[in-house]
Regions:
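Sensory/regulatory domains in signal-transduction proteins
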Residues: 2-136
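Juxtadomain coupling helices with adjacent low-complexity linkers
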Residues: 111-170
Length: 170
């Protein structure tokens, strides 16, 4: 399903939590009603679909590289994400994505899927994130993901923080 983006931002109340769960390959296994409402897609469309069905083309690939690196190493991650709705509108979230572990034993480290909870980001955070993502996307278009990774690495090194610490600093 290819969705053409339009310049129309959707928003939701700051007490709303958008939730999805995916399998190891990123296919949606669960979406809560709030998530289905904002993207304007029902379970028949979402369940079994790749989570990137809602990926907005304005999102830099480096953010997803960080996401998968953290998750596959068993760590949670936070990220600001611009997603696309079925009509091409977009919405911003601050996402907390965690690996889901096999719970057959208290010490299991086997990842069986992923859980994402998203909230409405603050305008202050977006004032920093939007221009950063635009810069990263421009770098990726001219020099690939390595170019945006270089920008992020320099930014994080200059601030002396990890990616997650940077994201949580807003």
């Amino acid at each position: 399903m290819k969705i053409t983006p339009i310049n129309n931002e959707k928003t939701f109340k700051d007490n709303v939590l958008l939730v999805t769960k995916t399998d190891l390959k990123g296919k949606i296994t669960y979406a809560n009603r709030a998530f289905m409402k904002i993207v304007d897609m029902n379970e028949d469309i979402l369940v079994g679909a790749p989570h990137n069905i809602i990926r907005h083309p304005d999102m830099p690939g480096i953010i997803f590289k960080y996401l998968w690196t953290y998750l596959q190493s068993g760590q949670e991650i936070h990220a600001y994400v611009k997603n696309i709705c079925s009509d091409g509108s977009y919405y911003w979230v601050i996402a907390n994505v965690t690996p889901s572990f096999d719970n057959t034993s208290a010490t299991s480290t086997k990842i069986i899927g992923y859980h994402s909870s998203r909230r409405l980001p603050t305008q202050g955070a977006l004032a920093v994130i939007k221009p950063l993502y635009e810069k990263l996307l421009r770098a990726e278009k001219s020099g690939g993901i390595a170019a945006s990774e270089k920008i992020m690495t320099e930014l994080l090194n200059d601030k002396g923080v990890s990616y997650d610490e940077f994201i949580l600093s807003f």
